[in-house]
Amino acid sequence: MENAPEKENTIPQLYAGAPPVRGARRIVFAPWALLEPAEGRANAEAVEAVREALIRCIARGGQPVLCLYAGEDPAWFTAKGGWLMEDNLRCFLRYVGRAARAFGHLTDEYVTFFEPNELVWKKSANRNLNLRFKMLSHMACAHVRAVKLVRDTRAQRQLEETRIGFVLRMYPAIDLRRELLRGDNAATASAYEILPLLAMARGDFLPPLRNTLRIRPGKWADFIAVSGGGDEKKRRYCCRAAATLTETEIWEVMDDREDR
């Protein structure tokens, strides 16, 4: 991000680790690989473990935010081509629908994807630039479809309206140039941050991202949670920069887990 407004705002915080105060929002991760170890078959023990994690968060005075995907692909999904295959998006959406039904009575706030841009540009073993854009396009499409699916599922079950968004990893522009935008990670800052943000928040797919599911423009996120490591000054800078790109509410991710 090149520029950010100078105005300081109070930014809602979302904790990926243990929150220091009661009433804070905390991410509860739902590990897809454990919840659906075989295609179409749920693992009852894993489902119960996530349910218990949500209940513990509530009992401790927290507000649980269920994260549906943080990079843990089931082996069977990877064997089918993973995020490179458009037809596989239905597998992810089937899992999302099941999660919304299983856990919807315990939370009304969701994160669809945790740092999808980081997963594609820094953690993916695939070094082909075109295939990386394909993965990111499919994840953005899956996010939008997941938002609609969760909203519809909750409406059918007469549950409270949901708030659903995604977590995006962001860096000041100088950090991107020094680290990410070199060698095998030769993407532009726009490709890393701006393209996924616009596609997932607004359904605005700019080239080279492809709108493979013909997503209509609209409001496809109630919030965007910005993560940026442990440097508070840089993280706040990125939050303000993200706010210049969309009218969507911006949250700040506080992550005190071990360095990932």
Model-derived features: positions:
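Conserved nucleotide-binding/hydrolysis modules and their immediate coupling elements
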Residues: T246
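Non-catalytic scaffold segments within catalytic domains of secreted glycoside hydrolases
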Residues: M1-G23, L34-F223, S227-E232, R236-R240, ...
